[in-house]
């Protein structure tokens, strides 16, 4: 499957979802979901950001093999700054989410801002909206 070359940016404050191109230079240099998501995080967030503030980001990322038949290709990563340690926190999971995200046309979802109330992200193929 490789890369779809699309990043979904979800602004919870504005209630908007926008597609942007994947930084392919970073994708080549920081291969894999963890490396690429971490690169996006450190480039976009102030190192002193409060983990519980609207300025912190939450990044869901897939790798180039996600959704293929390769062994362990069902893995995907979540990166943010954790409130417990104040450091970058990384979680890795398996299952169908990563492959489904990739099949919908997205390599990564970046959540930013803070919503006024509870919302959820509805992804239907290449369309995404907050409800």
Walk through the language-model features, giving the residues of each:
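Acidic carboxylate diad motif detector
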Residues: 1-131
């Amino acid at each position: 499957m490789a890369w779809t070359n699309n990043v979904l940016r979800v602004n919870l404050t504005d209630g908007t979802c926008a597609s942007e191109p994947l930084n392919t230079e970073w994708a080549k240099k920081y291969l894999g979901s963890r490396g690429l998501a971490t690169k996006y995080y450190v480039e976009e967030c102030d190192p002193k950001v409060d983990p519980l503030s609207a300025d912190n980001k939450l990044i869901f990322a897939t790798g180039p093999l996600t959704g293929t038949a390769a062994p362990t290709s069902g893995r995907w990563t979540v990166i943010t700054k954790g409130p417990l340690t104040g450091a970058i926190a990384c979680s890795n999971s398996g299952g169908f989410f990563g492959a489904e995200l990739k099949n919908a046309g997205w390599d990564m979802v970046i959540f930013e801002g803070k919503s006024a109330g509870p919302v959820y992200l509805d992804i239907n193929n290449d369309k995404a909206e907050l409800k």
